[in-house]
Amino acid sequence: MKHFKQVLTEARRMIRQDGDVSLTAVGFDANGRAFKIWMQVENDKDKERFGMAMAGNFMVHSAIEYYVFFTGWMVTLDRDETELKTRPSKDPRRREVLIVYGESPDEKAAQVYEVVRDAGERLLELKARDDLDEMVANNSQMRFAGMLGDTKRKHTQEDRERMRKMLKPMPEIFRIYGPEPLINPALN
């Protein structure tokens, strides 16, 4: 995956600059042109909307490689049965992490960093957790490969127009950036 290091650098820069990273997706087409969408996710409905916009944008722009990165909570796996019902954000042994995940038709990769903060919530350091990279890379919930541009399967113009229409009512929830974004903000 050609752009993994570039996206990893961007994710680390964002958390150092802003202190947090919203759910972000970056897609690349066959010519290496990129587009990026992100939003603050508050609930499951937001996740669904983000997933739909991500899928549509990958399809419309024939993405052949994509990356997702975000900060969140990871819990220890040695919890007993009663603790399993606790949401990760409420688990006292939770760890804040920055996850960067990428996928192309042939490969997938992930990098996990434990986020270390001081009492004032300022970022102190990002500790690479190489022991978790493979587990995250193989997590089926992370995969969106069906949305990538498949060289054997081309989306028709009709498919793309249908997806553009589905994305049109959601302009207010996504922020688009880039000097020349592939995506037209009016459609998203």
Task: Indicate where each model-derived feature is located.
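N-terminal domain-onset segments
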Residues: 1-54
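Low-complexity intrinsically disordered segments
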Residues: 52, 57-188
